[in-house]
Amino acid sequence: MAGLNIYVRRWRTALHATVSALIVAILGLAITPVASAATARATLSVTSTWQTGFIARFTITNSSTAPLTDWKLEFDLPAGESVLHTWNSTVARSGTHYVLSPANWNRIIAPGGSATGGLRGGLTGSYSPPSSCLLNGQYPCT
């Protein structure tokens, strides 16, 4: 009988260790890495201006090891300026605040990759550059 109790104790200890290791492994796999905007950066620069308009280009770069999905690039334009057309993005407007969102083909930026696009703006009066540019609502553009 004593030999059976030792066998049962060893078996239970081994079973508990195996189950514990399995639970830790499953929980570890359930937490997948997500790219944060802190590991991404954006630039928005005006490349040309003329009396009634301007062209601006943007680049969003994913420096993380996970895909960056559904990015948002937002900025403000002064009164008298507006976005007339975008490429490689869609645009939403609320007053003088604009938000560029990805097109269907560039909504996921692979690790180490980037998405580029631009916009054509119209203006009345003198030109002022976009301001308050943020990536994903919190990280300043360069």
From Swiss-Prot:
Residues 1-37 form the signal peptide. Keywords: Cell membrane, Cell wall, Membrane, Secreted, Signal, Virulence. InterPro entries: CBD2, CBM2/CBM3_carb-bd_dom_sf, CBM2_carb-bd_dom_sf. Residues 38-142 form the CBM2 domain. One of its GO terms (cellular component) is plasma membrane. GO terms for molecular function: cellulose binding; hydrolase activity, hydrolyzing O-glycosyl compounds. Gene3D superfamilies: 2.60.40.290. One of its GO terms (biological process) is carbohydrate metabolic process. The keyword Protease does not apply. It is found in: Secreted; Secreted, Cell wall; Cell membrane. Pfam families: CBM_2. Carbohydrate binding protein that binds chitin and cellulose. Lacks enzymatic activity and does not hydrolyze chitin and cellulose. May interact with mycobacterial biofilms, which are rich in cellulose, and play a role in biofilm formation. Could also act as an adhesin, improving the initial attachment to host cells and aiding M.tuberculosis during the initial stages of infection. Recombinant M.smegmatis harboring Rv1987 shows enhanced cytoadhesion to human lung epithelial cell line A549. Identified as a drug target. Also identified as a potential subunit vaccine candidate through a systemic immunoinformatics approach. Rv1987 exhibits a strong potential immunogenic response useful for the development of a tuberculosis vaccine that would be used in tuberculosis models to generate humoral and cellular immunities. This is Cellulose/chitin binding protein Rv1987.
